[in-house]
């Protein structure tokens, strides 16, 4: 934990050694503390009700090392995991790779349901689907319900192999989430959690917490 205006590190050495280490040390500490501090604010780690937030920032990071180190710092700041699989390989299970499915993956298949089914057949224990590639209520939601029914039929005695969550990544996230929650409950699937992403920060997340999101993705 770092506090404002409180010395974090004191290094005593000769002048040449101090000059050589200064840039690297400051770069490392400043970058990691920047990301970890932002993650703490977003996750509410320092509050009584921390949020479940996944780090998705690698595509916007300033280079590969920043993407990996940023994922590590975000987890230190309270994020539950990262979309960066390389970061998990580098740092181990502490920096867990998590996430849903991409628009590009869904568009690769002949139909949205084909994409959902392929993902579920590959990762039956962690099915989290993106619903807004085409149309949330007219396409994404019906196909999600169809897939969950398929999993129930395929694994009748394994309640862990169900659709875990549904993600919205565009439009009015609050309004869309409210409609989706109502529709899922009406379909008898209250166990499917909501995930929101796209341009979120701590203020937007605070305004959306009324809509019962299980997770947020930021990056």
Please provide the spans of the model-predicted regions:
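Structural detector of well-ordered beta-strand residues that form the stable sheet scaffold
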Residues: 128-130, 195, 217
């Amino acid at each position: 934990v770092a506090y404002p205006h409180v010395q974090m590190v004191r290094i005593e050495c000769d002048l040449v050694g101090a000059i050589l280490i200064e840039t690297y040390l400051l770069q490392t500490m400043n970058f990691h503390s920047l990301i970890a501090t932002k993650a703490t604010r977003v996750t509410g780690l320092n509050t009584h009700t921390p949020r479940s937030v996944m780090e998705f920032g690698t595509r916007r990071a300033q280079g590969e090392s920043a993407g990996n180190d940023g994922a590590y710092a975000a987890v230190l700041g309270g994020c539950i995991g990262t979309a960066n699989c390389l970061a998990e390989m580098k740092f181990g299970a502490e920096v867990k790779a998590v996430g849903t499915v991409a628009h590009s993956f869904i568009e690769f298949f002949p139909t949205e349901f084909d994409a959902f089914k392929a993902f579920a057949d590959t990762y039956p224990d962690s099915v989290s689907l993106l619903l807004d590639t085409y149309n949330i209520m007219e396409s994404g939601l019906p196909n999600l319900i169809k897939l969950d029914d398929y999993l129930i039929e395929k694994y009748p005695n394994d309640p862990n192999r169900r659709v875990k969550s549904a993600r919205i990544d565009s439009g009015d996230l609050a309004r869309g989430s409210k409609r989706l929650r109502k529709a899922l409950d009406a379909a008898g699937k209250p166990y499917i959690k909501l995930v929101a992403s796209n341009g979120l920060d701590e203020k937007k997340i605070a305004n959306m917490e009324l809509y019962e999101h299980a997770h947020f993705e930021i990056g």
